[in-house]
Amino acid sequence: MIKYTIDELFQLKPSLTLEVNFDAVEFRAIIEKVKQLQHLKEEEFNSHHVGHFGRRRSSHHHGRPKIKHNKPKVTTDSDGWCTFEAKKKGSGEDDEEETETTPTSTVPVATIAQETLKVKPNNKNISSNRPADTRDIVADKPILGFNAFAALESEDEDDEA
């Protein structure tokens, strides 16, 4: 097989014909060998760099991918109040084993306080199908209205007398 230097490759023209003794079979074998080596290198790289679900990072931001976390569990009771349930750290079996190994004494057991978060209820849960009692309704308009003309007339009458 003929080997060329970089300068010789730049001087070659694509329109030139191949040499008479060019061996295409050997050339194809070299190409297949290079393809196999590249495939093995990719497999080795992928086996060591499996992080972030095997995705490659894009080159325009050079940052780590953002991994979405599961939403916290929120329960809504019959009154419409939503309560956040914090994730318990550790398993309950470990706590039971620790209490069994300690001797029975008057040592207070530390408990983990569960944090709760109260949220305003939805307006749809507040509405009612029952009509409101008329005695509970506060009137917006005043019962006794003020008439300015009547007040002016009454002042005039007081002055005349």
Swiss-Prot record:
Q: What keywords were assigned to this record?
A: Cytoplasm, Initiation factor, Phosphoprotein, Protein biosynthesis, Protein synthesis inhibitor, Translation regulation
Among its keywords, does the record have Protein biosynthesis?
A: yes
Is Cytoplasm set as a keyword in this record? Answer: yes
The main location class comes to cytoplasm
Q: Misc remark for this entry?
A: Present with 26900 molecules/cell in log phase SD medium.
Name the gene for this chain: CAF20
Oligomer and partners = Interacts with TIF45.
From start to end residue, where is composition biased (Basic residues)?
A: 52-72
Q: How is it modified after translation?
A: Phosphorylated by casein kinase II complex (CK2).
Q: Where is this region: Disordered?
A: 52-108
What the protein does?
Answer: Acts as an inhibitor of cap-dependent translation. Competes with eIF4G1/TIF4631 and EAP1 for binding to eIF4E/TIF45 and interferes with the formation of the eIF4F complex, inhibiting translation and stabilizing mRNA. Binding affinity for eIF4E/TIF45 is 10-fold less than that of eIF4G1/TIF4631. Required for induction of pseudohyphal growth in response to nitrogen limitation, probably by regulating STE12 translation.
Extract the GO molecular function terms from the UniProt entry. eukaryotic initiation factor 4E binding; translation initiation factor activity
Protein name listed in UniProt = Cap-associated protein CAF20
Q: Which residues carry this modification: Phosphothreonine?
A: T99, T101, T102
Give the protein family: Belongs to the CAF20 family.
Compartment(s) = Cytoplasm
* GO annotation (BP), single: positive regulation of cytoplasmic mRNA processing body assembly
What superkingdom heads the lineage?
Eukaryota
Q: Where is the signal peptide?
A: none
According to the UniProt record, one GO cellular component term is:
cytoplasm
